[in-house]
Amino acid sequence: MSESLPRGEVEGPHAPRAAEPAPGDGTQLDPAAGPPPDSGLAIVSDSLPPVGVYGAPRPAVPQRLPLTPRFRGCGSGAGAGVGADAASPTGFRRLPDWLKVKLPGTGEYAGTKALLRRLRLHTVCEEARCPNLGHCWERGTATIMILGELCTRRCGFCAVAPGKPNGYVDWDEPRRVGEAVAEMGLRHTVITSVARDDLTDGGSTIFARVIGEIRRRSDTVIEVLIPDFRGHAQDLQRVIDARPEVINHNIETVARLHPVVRPSARYARSLDLLRQVKQSGAPIKVKSGIMLGLGEQQDEVMQTLRDLVAHGCELLTIGQYLRPTPQHLPVIEYVRPETFRWWGEQAHALGFESVASGPLVRSSFHADELAGTVRPGERSKTG
């Protein structure tokens, strides 16, 4: 393989931050009472009540941070988009044919988009610039992203906007997610989020409430793709207790590349999260995913797969890393489809129950088939 990426400095996890009140009328809320009905507002308090209510003064307005080149080898060309590459003067390189996808169409795509806009919901499909957006939305499916559109981390591979949410929580969001899932008639629902290190519970309370609101309105299978909650076991347990059918947490890359690819995460911490889900005894499938093309070596990928199996992972996705903008990590290699098929075979041999491996595979792509909700090729509704 090509030369691997340079090592970076390991950054410590973000400590919880108390947000400053926004300029306004100075109205103060009772922290013990939680957010007012229909306010959609909350802020981090010094201590989190058992039910996970944040409650306190009005929060500052969430602040989006600019994307700036953060990684050695990243270009600053005018172009941006899937497949951008520092080796090109414009920040792009030509994509191989197997990575080319058709543009979004109409019909179900337009209906899905209209529904999400009406209910003021974000999707990881849009925020992370997923290449499968057109395919999934035309099937009437989408992966809903909760807890806002600003992430408190700056991972080297991710297109989701970094920013300072300043403790903002939309308390009405769980209800709207429940309505969207019911209206779309989903049989398999995928919920994910940005990382919210500014919240004392990492956003786990909202995850639990979203699961509860979906349960009230639908008998859909619920899959959640969660952050690491900075290793806080009680926050993860809150999600486990809400009983989704699948908990997914992506390892993303091999151990050696974590300091560059996921500077605010830890390889061992992600493995521990998967182990905690498995050892909880809850009837929950454990899922993870890894990207190829960042400079990893074959033996490193194999060791990562072994580590995942050893920590209880049952479902696995393997996909190609595609550079979102010239400010993100460059693609070291475009892995061929036959190599992905080989990795899928290796993963099955190691003991994974179900594996999706291909250049365009993403965490929630055909998640229903991977989890066994429907048979491969059967027309389904998954989001």
Which sequence ranges carry the predicted segments?
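Short connector loops/turns at beta-strand edges and beta->alpha or beta->beta junctions
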Residues: 149-152, 186, 252-254, 321-323
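Auxiliary Fe-S-binding modules of radical SAM enzymes
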Residues: 1-3, 29-30, 34, 38-143, ...
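Core AdoMet radical
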Residues: 159-176, 181-274, 287, 291, ...
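Conserved functional loop/turn residues at catalytic and ligand-binding sites
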Residues: 150, 154, 159, 185, ...
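A secondary-structure boundary/capping signal
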Residues: 126, 146-147, 192, 225, ...
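Glycine-biased, low-complexity coil/linker segments
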Residues: 8-10
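Local cysteine-cluster metal-coordination motifs and their immediate loop/turn environment
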Residues: 124-136, 147-162
